[in-house]
From Swiss-Prot:
Its EC number is 6.1.1.11. Keywords: Aminoacyl-tRNA synthetase, ATP-binding, Cytoplasm, Ligase, Nucleotide-binding, Protein biosynthesis. This is Serine--tRNA ligase. SUPFAM superfamilies: Class II aaRS and biotin synthetases, tRNA-binding arm. It comes from Prochlorococcus marinus (strain AS9601). Homodimer. The tRNA molecule binds across the dimer. It comes from the Bacteria. The keyword Ligase applies. Catalyzes the attachment of serine to tRNA(Ser). Is also able to aminoacylate tRNA(Sec) with serine, to form the misacylated tRNA L-seryl-tRNA(Sec), which will be further converted into selenocysteinyl-tRNA(Sec). ATP binds at R264, R265, E266, E351, I352, S353, S354. Pathway: Aminoacyl-tRNA biosynthesis; selenocysteinyl-tRNA(Sec) biosynthesis; L-seryl-tRNA(Sec) from L-serine and tRNA(Sec): step 1/1. InterPro entries: aa-tRNA-synt_IIb (IPR002314), aa-tRNA-synth_II (IPR006195), aa-tRNA-synth_II/BPL/LPL (IPR045864), Ser-tRNA-ligase_type_1 (IPR002317), Ser-tRNA-synth_1_N (IPR015866), SerRS_1_N_sf (IPR042103), SerRS_core (IPR033729), tRNA-bd_arm (IPR010978). It catalyses: tRNA(Ser) + L-serine + ATP = L-seryl-tRNA(Ser) + AMP + diphosphate + H(+); tRNA(Sec) + L-serine + ATP = L-seryl-tRNA(Sec) + AMP + diphosphate + H(+).
């Protein structure tokens, strides 16, 4: 979340920074709420101070006088009771006002980085580089055509089981998925990440801390009888892991990697990517996550992106690196680098990883701090897919397809898959 002090003291600057996202943000009403909140905070603090002084005075009067029912003492006690009533009334106003302020500020996105390219939407994202040679030739099959011919996944039966946009992996398809998960986890743990396996169900406070709630409640699946949601990404439980904690600075950076199933409604994608593995309600992903010193998050952002890139390079999958423009940034991100893998059937690159620096945005929402330079400071959080499993499988199927209908397995994956070819069982 954004700093309330900044909203209170410089609302114009806040509006200008948010406008870089290509949308007009008017926060005058939030500014008024934060000013009123500060006034009440000061008034409560002043009354509490006066109440403490009065308590000391009452103790002194009692100590000096043998008459515990004197007029002076009764007047002081009456005044003390008035203080308590007034403080209680103000604290109730404070509680209501705090909720109003939080409800408003929780809906404001992060400030875009001054280094992010200015733009209105994905058409103005900036390509930084490409890697590998994209496969371009005639008669290229799509990954879902390959999957069906090799009988490695089935969407029709999955629709019968659940609904559309679900997939059942079969035989070598399930085996390939498992191989990819193990390969990615091994790569990242060798690179200094601690492997975690968090819960797939998360509460509302966790989703609020990472930025999914309250704005994106319609994009996630909620359990009707509990305050629990199916996690849309491991970013959510990994952020919540240290909620309300003061992390010892000597432990920073904390680098986590987690495989998890992810669940999304894909509410705004009707009619898009209806076939195959690209856009599903349930998919698997390996997530990278950092907690770091604020002074080191820019370098950490480069490193987490390089770590995600290393998987694509090991699998010999052509990709490009894209700097996301201000108008296309995710809600919690200040700057994002996307990795997009080449899918020859559609003759284009498709997102396979987003590596984001959220600065202190999630740490403020989750109250995660560290004592840095003798001051309790909100730390910075970073996240990135390392990688999305289904999209990686789609890229392997399309880029590795052979004329006989089989698929060449990348060399780095052979020890995990157990064969250098994927073919009909």
């Amino acid at each position: 979340m954004l700093d309330q002090k900044l909203i209170r003291e410089n609302p114009t600057s806040v509006e200008e920074n948010l406008s870089l996202r290509g949308k007009v943000y008017k926060i005058s009403h939030i500014h008024e709420l934060t000013v009123k909140k500060k006034e009440i905070d000061i008034e409560i603090s002043s009354l509490q101070s006066e109440s403490k002084k009065l308590s000391k005075l009452i103790s002194q009067v009692i100590g000096k006088s043998q008459d515990n029912n004197s007029q002076e003492l009764n007047d002081l006690k009456k005044k003390g009771n008035e203080y308590r009533i007034k403080i209680s009334e103000l604290e109730e106003k404070q509680r209501i006002l705090n909720k109003k302020v939080d409800d408003e500020i929780y809906n404001l996105p992060n400030f875009p980085s001054k280094d992010a390219p200015i733009g209105k939407d994905e058409s103005e994202n900036l390509q930084i580089k490409t890697w590998g040679d994209p496969l371009i030739k005639e008669n290229i099959k799509s990954h879902w055509e390959i999957g069906e011919s090799l009988n490695i996944f089935d969407s029709i039966k999955s629709t019968k089981i659940s609904k559309s946009r679900f997939i059942t992996l079969i035989g070598n398809g399930a085996r390939l998925e498992r191989a990819l998960i193990n390969f990615m986890l091994d790569m990242h743990t060798k690179n200094g990440y601690l492997e975690l396996m968090p819960p797939a169900l998360v509460n509302s406070e966790s989703l609020t801390g990472s930025g999914q709630l309250p704005k994106f409640s319609n994009e996630s699946f909620k359990c009707s009888n509990d305050d629990l949601w199916l996690s849309p990404t491991a970013e959510v439980p990994l952020t919540a892991l240290h909620r309300n904690e003061l992390i010892d600075p000597k432990h920073l950076p904390l680098k986590y990697v987690a495989y998890s199933p992810c669940f999304r409604r894909e509410a705004g994608s009707y009619g898009r990517d209806t076939k195959g593995l690209i856009r599903l309600h349930q998919f698997n992903k390996v997530e990278l996550y950092w907690f770091c010193d604020p002074s080191k998050s820019l370098e950490a952002h480069k490193e987490i992106t390089t770590d995600a890139e290393s998987i694509l390079k090991k699998l010999n999958l052509p990709y490009r690196l894209v700097d996301i423009c201000t108008g296309d940034l995710g809600f919690s991100s200040s700057r994002t680098f996307d990795l997009e893998v080449w899918l020859p059937s559609s003759k284009c690159y498709r997102e396979i990883s987003s590596c984001s620096n959220c600065l202190d945005f999630q740490a403020r929402r989750s109250s995660i701090r560290s004592k840095i330079d003798k001051k309790n400071t909100y730390i910075h959080t970073l996240n990135g897919s390392g990688l999305a499993i289904g999209r990686t499988m789609a890229a392997i199927l399309e880029n590795g397809q052979q004329t006989d209908g089989s698929v060449k397995i990348p060399d780095a994956l052979v020890p995990y898959f157990g064969s250098n070819l994927l073919k009909t069982a």
